[in-house]
């Protein structure tokens, strides 16, 4: 005789075994809401809260937007009202030439690059050097205008030599050795006969003779 307290095994035609979720537990739990997932502690997806997804466009409150706009306008007006910092400076200091071919003796002793303009030495600019090249050119230097240009360079070079009986530092485009075994006379040594020698061209255009 079958015990009435022991449930019978389900058959294929039973209602409790028709659902996949309750097929394994239909023999013990005829309530279709009880599944293996609920026994393990999982809840239904319908009862779970949906995760909050933030929108791609960030929402800015009107008060924050107004404060940002006012701060940007105040900053823009402050920049317009600000006077230029270098307006009080004199014109020579404000438009200072940074390029120098040679060292000037009458510059500021502190190395600030301020030209005092005493007239002892004249600064040679890059524009003057390029103007000489444009004026004479390669063909003029090697042909008819060579003598004229050489005379100008040699004359300026001789004017810059000290009147103390010292000999020249350059000759024929090369640095002369020290006069240790020679007697120094007042006559200067011949300078270069061609402007194409780079040291001589530098010596001719330098204001103080020192690079």
UniProtKB/Swiss-Prot annotation:
Disordered, as annotated region: 1-27, 54-94
Query: Where does the chain cross the membrane?
Result: none
Tissue/organ expression:
Expressed in inflorescences, stems, rosette leaves and weakly in roots.
Inducing factors: Rapid but transient down-regulation by wounding, salicylic acid treatment or pathogen infection.
Q: Where is the composition biased (Low complexity)?
A: 1-19, 61-74
Q: Which cysteines are joined by disulfide bonds?
A: none
- Domain of life here? Eukaryota
| InterPro entries per UniProt | At3g17950-like
Oligomeric and partner information: Interacts with RLK902.
Name it.
Answer: Uncharacterized protein At3g17950
Native organism: Arabidopsis thaliana
